[in-house]
């Protein structure tokens, strides 16, 4: 059986049920991350922002800080913390460069890279300024 045409790209690769479940898990994780960051005083500038270098899960702002946020949802805390590989960090750095090129008014802000870890039955964990390029 072919997946529906409106299904996310991940669902069209391999097993449709697994891809769709992963897509939904990602949406729920990003929603939890948005709620956490809003409670901490951040304003969401963009969600699932697509750039030529790749997708940025969240772009948030608080004061003069502009954060590119990667959301990682895993079954265990250690797996979530280790899920962001150096290759993905470089991709996010390139995507952030595209973001700043597309929206030059953000260039005056202090750019940083954050990670939000989502683990079942635990509070989401926000790692502000998780790495420096």
Swiss-Prot record:
It comes from the Bacteria. Gene3D superfamilies: 3.40.1350.10. One of its GO terms (molecular function) is nucleic acid binding. Belongs to the UPF0102 family. This is UPF0102 protein Plav_3586. It comes from Parvibaculum lavamentivorans (strain DS-1 / DSM 13023 / NCIMB 13966). The lineage of its organism: Bacteria, Pseudomonadati, Pseudomonadota, Alphaproteobacteria, Hyphomicrobiales.
